[in-house]
Amino acid sequence: MKKRILWITISLGIMSLIFYFSSQNGETSQQTSDFFLPLLQHIPNASFLIRKTAHFTIFGCLGLSYYQSLSTFPIKKRTCILLSIILVFCYAISDEIHQSFTNGRSCQLSDVFLDTFGGSTYIILCTLYQKRGGSNS
């Protein structure tokens, strides 16, 4: 029960963080990405890569937290995986819709796919780690 509460709390925290980032106007969002530019200034299109990597990573963490939350319930592992991916996809859609109402931001279907891919990747890596004898949590 403690693990369930922990993972649900982590999921809600990540969702809140995503919502916060999506609430930032275009200029503020760009400044957040540009913070990392000095480290990667030699890479072409570094700002674009930073933003897309952030999408992949934060939705990967969300997918992982969804999977861990669902795995505390008495349901099959395949069902946990599928439901986690569906939840990531749904939250990615809602995130892009939210961004479309934010000044200087837009709704991009490609980001929904990237977010879902990030979530799916983290979920699959977690299940492979567990299958190889890693921790169950």
Place the predicted regions along the sequence by residue.
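Small-polar-interrupted transmembrane alpha-helices in polytopic inner-membrane proteins
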Residues: 13-18, 80-100
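Short alpha-helical transmembrane interface motifs in multi-pass membrane proteins
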Residues: 47-51, 79-84
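Interfacial helix-loop-helix junctions of multi-pass membrane proteins
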Residues: 93-116
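"…centered on the first transmembrane helix and the immediately adjacent amphipathic helix/loop
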Residues: 1-67
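Terminal transmembrane helix and immediately flanking juxtamembrane interfaces
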Residues: 1-22, 110, 119-137
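Membrane-interfacial alpha-helical segments at the cytosolic side of multi-pass membrane proteins
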Residues: 56-72, 117-132
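Membrane-interface helix-boundary motifs at transmembrane edges
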Residues: 1-3, 71-79
